[in-house]
Amino acid sequence: MITIKRKFPFPLLYLVIEDELPPQFISCKQIKMNKVVLFPGLKRNISFQYVIDTIPRGEHTFSSVRVKTGDLFGMMEKEVTFSVPNTFLVYPQYVDIAYQQLENHFEQGVLSANINSAKDSTISVGVRDYKPGDRFSWIDWKATARTNNIMTKEFEQQRSHNIMIFIDRTESPLFESVVTFTASIVRAVLKQNSPASFVSIGKEQTIFPLDNGDTQLQQILCHLAKVQADSVFPLSQSVDMELRKIYEPVTVILVTSNLSPDIQKAADCAAIRNRKCMVFVVKEKANQLSHREISIIETLKKRQIFVNTVYENRYTNVFFEVSK
């Protein structure tokens, strides 16, 4: 809403008010709604508001408002631009994803021991809040009585379920979909209070160390709100460099829209270092994989690297689909 207050009720025949929009808004359908002609007369307070339904993600600044008036015959016109900077951040879109399926997938897969059968014979190393799907035998009754909340034993295997997410910032017409899917995965993982680190390397290098909780989520979403497709180095180089710094068990997730030889090399880097690896390839719709991409998928699957092609607006059960 734009409000103009006048000290003196001088009669105005008309008033043209235009809110100058950021350049990113040029393609918005509602762009003409930022300009209005009013007939204020003697009113001291003049207001108008408009709504932009679709705003691109990013940091946007509304810098100024242009006001114009004149007489009935057009012999006199007066135009003034007021500087009223206002900056706000638009977070990326996201979709609710059932992250629990990721743990089930690795527990059933060939890349790790079957935790379901091993937990009973494993020494617990701590306690945590109960989660749906936890066994009755895992409940720590002493901790439950002490905290008045149902507490579950935490095992060493569970602590090894750290996630390391890489976003491919290579220029692509599907980059916005890559950002949306990445934001969805990050949110799903951290909302389950699972530790996650995030690596985003383009013209600038942004790395969020292993952590969990809402603060980590907000920081990563803030970065994804402003991230650009400006990759300078191959993703495989970033993966290899970052994995050299990590010694604890970690599951690597790569998000891309183009399953290139470099992405294959990045997945191989993770596998060589005995890291579990999942590759998500974002496409607009089905049957858009090239012959090269299909060949790379077959090669990676032979190396027990999990690959899943995901499509726009169909992200909800991506982990469940991989585990089939």
Question: Where are the regions that the model predicts?
Answer:
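Exposed, interaction-prone extracellular/peripheral surfaces
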Residues: 132, 136-324
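An amphipathic, basic-hydrophobic helix/alpha-beta surface used to engage anionic
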Residues: 1-211, 251-255, 269
